[in-house]
Amino acid sequence: MNPKAIKLHGVALLDYFNGDENATIIIRRDDGYESPLPVRLFFREPSEFIPTNKAAIENCRGHVLDVGAGTGLYSLALQQKGFTVTAIDINQQAVEIMIQRSVKDVQCADIFEYSEGQFDTIGLFR
C-alpha cells in the first residue's frame, strides 16, 4: 500500500477519534471510481458487525493475531470474550488509537514479521 495513503488513512482515523464525527475517507480507484467511506464504520459496536465477522469471532481459538487491526474494533470484541489478542497494523496512527482504546497487545508490524505457529488463530477482519 502507498505510504502516503496509509498516513492519510491514519489522519482520518485520528480525526474521528478526536471528535470529528463527519470524518470521511474518499476511496479513489485507478478506473476513476470514487466512493465516500464514513470513518465511523471503523469504530462501530460488535452488534453492528456483519454476520460473517460475528461467525469468525465465534470460531476463534486460543491466542489470536488480528492482522490489519486498524482501530482495534475486533481485537476489543475478542478481548471482551476472554481471548488473548495480538493486534498488528502497519499504520502508526491506528496503533496509537488501539493503545488509547485499551487493546492490550498492540504492535506496529507487518504479518510477515511473524513465524509459523506463534498463534492459534489468525484473523483478517473487515
Stretches with model-predicted labels:
Residues 102-113:
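Conserved SAM-binding strand-loop segment of SAM-dependent methyltransferases
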Residues 71-83:
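Conserved SAM-binding loop of SAM-dependent methyltransferases across substrates and taxa
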Residues 123:
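A conserved beta-strand element that flanks and buttresses the S-adenosyl-L-methionine
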Residues 95-97:
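Short alpha-helix immediately C-terminal to the canonical SAM-binding loop
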Residues 21-53:
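Conserved SAM-binding loop and adjacent beta-strand
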Residues 91-92:
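Conserved SAM/SAH-binding beta-strand->alpha-helix loop
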Residues 61-70:
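Conserved class I S-adenosyl-L-methionine
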Residues 1-27:
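N-terminal auxiliary segments of SAM/dcSAM-dependent transferases
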